[in-house]
Amino acid sequence: MMNTASVKDGWVDSDGLRLHYVSWGRDDAPAVVMLHGLRSYAHTWEPVADALVDRYRVVALDQRGRGLSDWDPQRDYYAAAYVRDLDALVRALDLRRFVLVGHSMGGANAFVYAAAQPERLTGLGIEDMGPGASAGSQGSERIKRELKETPGAFASWDDARAFWRRQRPNITESALDSRIAHSLKEAGSGRIVWRHDADGIAAARLDATPAQLVHLWPLILNLHVPTLLLRGGESDFLSADVAAEMTAANAGIERIDIHGATHYVHDDQPAAFNRALRTWLDRLDDPTWRVGG
């Protein structure tokens, strides 16, 4: 298990919101910044950090409305706002060069950031995200159904655990434990409620206008950062065909399919995910990043 002395919590302000982040490892190690998915949280990356922390600094942000970060009263849960938050984090930590990794929504945000500030990035890691996945895939329709059908509270922790297990039948028991611990909390009434802004996030996802959606193809075609695409071999979100089109469109994208994983690759097959990411990180050639900061 990870040495808990290497784990630190921090806070950063963005758009008047107080946002929480977690940092694992030495401050002077090469930085890897990680962005979670739609209804996730910073600590989802803890097993990944455990696999990297001997050589890298891993920083994970509770994106606005999730984890311990403030909810946005304006419900601005869209890419432009998330990228402002990421920029605030990067500047607060004075990260001159870093690798950016994102899952699903976090992957879309990572693509947007890479297009805006490529000079800061040594590499880009994308977990199961690509063009059209959020709008036209079977997985996107599944997620919309989940958002509509998710209860606002549970009578007990057992009920909450059973709900998450039905929603994520493939994730490991340790990943399920993490979801219970970090996505839920006990209210004063004794009911179990969500830590994240479930209603606001659902409204933003279900009612997004075309202008609020991220169109990834232009970003991918103009991407000039070494990129690792980690796709779930059983994903209903990012199809094998779209992943193939991404690598064909940009020679800088390296693709690895993780067998036995759905859209939630790092939760379903953590050992394979961590091994693939670590191998790729160890190969990146950027002396400025290697010296830390």
Model-derived regions: residue spans:
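Conserved HGGG/HGGXW glycine-rich cap/lid loop of the alpha/beta-hydrolase fold
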Residues: L17-W71, D285
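Conserved acidic catalytic loop of the alpha/beta-hydrolase fold
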Residues: A81-F98
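Short beta-strand immediately N-terminal to the catalytic nucleophile in serine-hydrolase-like folds
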Residues: L100-G102, E127
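Gly/Ala-rich beta-loop-alpha elbow adjacent to hydrolase catalytic centers
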Residues: G102, G106, A110
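Flexible "cap/lid" loop of the alpha/beta hydrolase fold
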Residues: F111-A115, T122-W157
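Conserved alpha/beta-hydrolase catalytic His-Asp/Glu region
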Residues: G152-A211
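Conserved serine/cysteine hydrolase catalytic core
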Residues: E186-A248, E254-D257
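Catalytic histidine-centered segment of alpha/beta-hydrolase-like enzymes
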Residues: A261-P270, N274
